[in-house]
């Protein structure tokens, strides 16, 4: 039996707000009773793994205020501005310099100081730290960088959780690479616990289920974190808009079903409002026709702290990836991806996806 039996050794790429909420969240729920239900997790004990079994053993970043520092310090450093939910003791994990590639956009480059340390050999670090699962939290638009780390995961035999909208698990070529290597992947693009995507998806489906014709809809998002600042660079946004849009329209059967590019569907980030910090405000409108073609419109606003809203979902994704690794399963984990991600290889209705994931957990 391995000396690390019973734990999940996790590496993080990108020590931003999402990583901060993840690390704090594991600390927050460390002593949770496995027989209770807590906000934001499917189960305190997910298969054989309790939240406290998630152990951070490596981290990569490019920010000079994070590289070279203990993970417990780095999660509160530089531009990180999410809500604090836990004191994190020193981890003895020093954040290492990853390769930049296309991970730094124009607005990032204007805001942070990039570390002048030499990039490390990522595959070597993953192997030496005996990492089980690599979580990619790179900024939106980091196509080349995300694929670099995905390949590192394959080369090191490490399960991959792809939290950003770069299409890897949902790309048949990449899916086959993971399958052939016997390496599991959960992706792509993390769904929040209750965010703009899931509420919009549910309300749009409700219109159809109640016989209302959905003619047009929009979802506008503003936030104050580095994610929203980065997304002001419209060229980095394409995959994000596609991911958020198909997450809503894939669940429909009417005129807007499966639409990504359509005049009557507009879903995406809109602006950066610095004083919101890590809060995100979503403004959603649905316009339809009810009985007699009479207009029926719904408008709502959602206010959330952005990063904690997805941290629990990542904890579940990490545990699903480790269970797959334990069972020798390679390639996309379809049930986990469908329930936990916006752009999985196979879209399923949320209730169906959850039921399939429960079945997967039970084995």
Curated annotation (Swiss-Prot):
NAD among keywords: yes
Catalytic function, reaction form: D-glucose 6-phosphate = 1D-myo-inositol 3-phosphate
GO annotation (BP), single: phospholipid biosynthetic process
Pfam family, one: Inos-1-P_synth
Cofactor: NAD(+)
Catalytic activity, EC: 5.5.1.4
Keywords: Inositol biosynthesis, Isomerase, Isopeptide bond, NAD, Ubl conjugation
Residue numbers binding NAD(+): 70, 129, 149, 192, 227, 240
Entry's Gene Ontology molecular function annotations: inositol-3-phosphate synthase activity
InterPro entries: MIPS, Myo-inos-1-P_Synthase, Myo-inos-1-P_Synthase_actino, Myo-inos-1-P_Synthase_GAPDH, NAD(P)-bd_dom_sf
Cross-link (Isoglutamyl lysine isopeptide (Lys-Gln) (interchain with Q-Cter in protein Pup)): 65
Description of post-translational modifications: Pupylated at Lys-65 by the prokaryotic ubiquitin-like protein Pup, which leads to its degradation by the proteasome.
PANTHER family: INOSITOL-3-PHOSPHATE SYNTHASE (PTHR43125:SF1)
Other facts: Was identified as a natural substrate of the M.smegmatis proteasome.
Function of the protein: Key enzyme in myo-inositol biosynthesis pathway that catalyzes the conversion of glucose 6-phosphate to 1D-myo-inositol 3-phosphate in a NAD-dependent manner.
Family per record: Belongs to the myo-inositol 1-phosphate synthase family.
Protein name: Inositol-3-phosphate synthase
């Amino acid at each position: 039996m391995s000396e690390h039996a019973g734990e999940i050794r996790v590496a993080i790429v990108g020590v931003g707000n999402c990583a901060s909420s993840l690390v704090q969240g594991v600390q927050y729920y460390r002593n949770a009773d496995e027989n209770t239900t807590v906000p934001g997790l499917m189960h305190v004990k997910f298969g054989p793994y309790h939240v406290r079994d998630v152990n951070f053993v490596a981290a990569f970043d490019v920010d000079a205020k994070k590289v070279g520092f203990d993970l417990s310090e780095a999660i509160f450093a530089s531009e990180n501005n999410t809500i604090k939910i836990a004191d994190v003791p020193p981890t003895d994990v020093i954040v290492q310099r990853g390769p930049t590639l296309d991970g730094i956009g124009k607005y990032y480059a204007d805001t942070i100081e990039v570390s002048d340390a030499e990039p490390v050999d990522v595959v070597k670090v993953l192997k030496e730290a005996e990492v089980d699962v690599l979580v990619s939290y790179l900024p939106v638009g980091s196509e080349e960088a995300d694929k670099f780390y995905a390949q590192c995961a394959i080369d090191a035999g490490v399960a991959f959780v792809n939290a950003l909208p770069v299409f890897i698990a949902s790309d048949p070529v990449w899916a086959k690479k993971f399958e052939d290597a016997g390496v599991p992947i959960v992706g792509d693009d993390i769904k929040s616990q209750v965010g703009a995507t899931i509420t919009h998806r549910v309300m749009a489906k409700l219109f159809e289920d109640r016989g209302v014709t959905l003619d047009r809809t929009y979802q506008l998002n503003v936030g104050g974190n580095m994610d929203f600042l980065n997304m002001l660079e419209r060229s980095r946004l394409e995959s994000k808009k596609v991911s958020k849009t198909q997450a809503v329209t894939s669940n429909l059967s009417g005129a807007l079903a499966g639409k990504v590019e359509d005049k009557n569907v507009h879903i995406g980030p809109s602006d950066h409002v610095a004083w919101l910090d890590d809060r995100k405000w979503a403004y959603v409108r649905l316009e339809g026709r009810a009985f007699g073609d009479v207009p029926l419109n719904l408008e709502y606003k959602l206010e959330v702290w952005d990063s904690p809203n997805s941290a629990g979902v990542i904890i579940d994704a990490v545990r699903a990836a480790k269970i797959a690794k334990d069972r020798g399963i390679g390639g996309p984990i379809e049930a986990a991806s469908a329930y936990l991600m916006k752009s999985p290889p196979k879209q399923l209705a949320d209730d169906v996806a959850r039921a399939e994931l429960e079945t997967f957990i039970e084995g």
